[in-house]
């Protein structure tokens, strides 16, 4: 069995998360797929950024939604991680997709629920994916499931991912993914370790599972032994131990 290694926010253990450097480092270190976060600016430009607040990453107050793209491009998104990354910028989604066009695996978008997206902004997001010819390699996930459904209505072919944070959510989220069709379950990994029978039950309904965020070899091996084939990680990539292990 071959395992799909998915770089969380790019190769975020060696470069500042969600930057072009982190995304490219994941490709260079042979991650199969990449996960990153998407938000929308005040002037309706999709960008790659995780937090609601800009403060942790840039040292600047405010949110992505409150800033224009020109304002965001003035901010340093690298120094918080290491001085050697001074000058890293928050990438636009368009820039990120251009950098990732060579990847042969999946792109997992985590659309953050920090702001309401207009119909036009959703069309902009989907348009960028299609213009990059990455529609058949994209999975959209979000805790805002209304937003997911809006995306599906705009693009009936787009693949969706439904989050699971705790075991009590499993029945409902599996049902949603099954009903949506062309969808996966995106689960916190311990939920699956605690309830491994759910793996086959879910697959019997035509729904695959990706787990997050696995950074210990022991957990990785346990999940693979249970049959999990898609694993999101911050650090278990390339020479960091397991990329070349095939089970």
Task: Identify the role of each PLM range.
Residues 1-247:
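Phosphate-group recognition and catalysis centered on beta-loop-alpha active-site segments
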């Amino acid at each position: 069995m071959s395992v799909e290694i998915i770089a969380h926010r790019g190769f975020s253990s060696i470069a500042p998360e969600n930057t072009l450097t982190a995304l490219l480092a994941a490709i260079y270190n042979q991650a199969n797929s990449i996960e990153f976060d998407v938000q929308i600016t005040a002037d309706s430009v999709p960008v790659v950024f995780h937090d609601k607040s800009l403060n942790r990453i840039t040292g600047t107050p405010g949110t992505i939604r409150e800033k224009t793209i020109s304002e965001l491009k003035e901010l340093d998104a690298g120094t918080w991680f290491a001085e050697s990354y001074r000058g890293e910028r928050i990438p636009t989604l368009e820039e990120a997709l251009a950098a990732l066009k060579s990847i042969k695996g999946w792109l997992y978008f985590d659309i953050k629920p920090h702001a309401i997206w207009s119909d036009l902004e959703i069309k902009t997001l989907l348009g960028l994916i299609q213009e990059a010819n990455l529609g058949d390699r994209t999975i959209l996930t979000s805790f805002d499931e209304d937003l997911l459904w809006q995306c599906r209505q705009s693009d009936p072919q787009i693949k969706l991912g439904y989050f699971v944070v705790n075991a009590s959510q499993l029945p409902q989220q599996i049902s949603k993914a099954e009903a949506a069709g062309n969808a996966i379950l995106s689960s916190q990994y311990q939920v699956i370790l605690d309830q491994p029978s759910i793996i086959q039950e879910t697959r019997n309904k035509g729904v695959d599972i990706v787990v997050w965020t696995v950074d210990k070899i022991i957990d990785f091996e346990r999940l693979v032994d249970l049959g999990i084939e898609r694993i999101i990680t911050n650090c278990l990539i390339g020479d960091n131990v397991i990329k070349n292990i095939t089970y």
